[in-house]
Amino acid sequence: MVRSYEHPEAKDVSLPRVLFALSDPVRLEMVRILARREAVNSLDLGPDMPKSTVTHHTRILREAGVTRTRSQGRNCWISLRREVLDTKFPGLLDAVLAAEADR
């Protein structure tokens, strides 16, 4: 059985939710990984974390509209909704990632 995930429509992605999702260092690191790759197995986003912790953080990113999750067999593949974020909030993701890279 393939699991389906709820994702907000692009029009429903809000700045406060996106900023909240990006405010956590763990989720920010996940987004940095996703920004470099097309899709990542969810377990590769937090190999040293309990699965429940990875699930918690990926759920917050997905519900905020930052990521898209798709199920394929026993794996969950996560991808960054870059086009949605860049359209709704031009420059936001690049600024956040650049600021984090400067640390």
Give the predicted meaning of each segment:
Residues 2-28:
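Short alpha-helical segments that sit at the start of domains
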Residues 11-15, 19, 36, 77-103:
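Conserved segment of winged-helix/HTH DNA-binding domains
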Residues 26, 53, 84:
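Two-component histidine kinase catalytic core, primarily the HATPase_c
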Residues 63-73, 79:
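Beta-hairpin "wing" of winged helix-turn-helix
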